[in-house]
């Protein structure tokens, strides 16, 4: 299941801290809704966070500029979120294959190209 929260950037909390708190809140909400309980999140240096004692429960959290998403499932999963915005062609060359660049550049407007680029970017990041 996927859970989403939005917020207005600004205020007394640094946005990354706010996103972290919202992400963990969404995770706990999702765990309660799907499994009727929560688990402690643990993370070893350099590894992905996991739920202590919940080998059959997976989660993934992503956040960016006022948007936080969390997915919870009984199988491997991934999520990513980005705001659609202008991007540099050099970035596209680094992260997209030739056929993917063609897909992006086929967009009829700059807005369509941005949407196509970030669709690919988030798909790749979620894996």
Would you name each region that the model predicts?
Residues 1-127:
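Core catalytic alpha/beta fold that binds nucleotide/phospho-ligands
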């Amino acid at each position: 299941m996927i859970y989403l929260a939005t917020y207005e950037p600004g205020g007394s909390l640094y946005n990354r801290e706010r996103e972290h708190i919202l992400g963990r809140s969404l995770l706990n909400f999702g765990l309660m809704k799907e499994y009727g309980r929560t688990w402690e999140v643990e993370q070893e240096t350099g590894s992905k966070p996991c739920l202590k004692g919940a080998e059959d429960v997976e989660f993934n959290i992503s956040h960016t500029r006022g948007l936080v998403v969390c997915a919870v499932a009984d199988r491997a999963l991934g999520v990513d979120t980005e705001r659609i915005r202008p991007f540099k062609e050099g970035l596209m060359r680094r992260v997209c294959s030739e056929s993917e660049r063609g897909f992006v550049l086929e967009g009829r407007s700059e807005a369509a190209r941005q949407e196509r680029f970030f669709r690919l970017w988030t798909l790749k990041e979620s894996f």
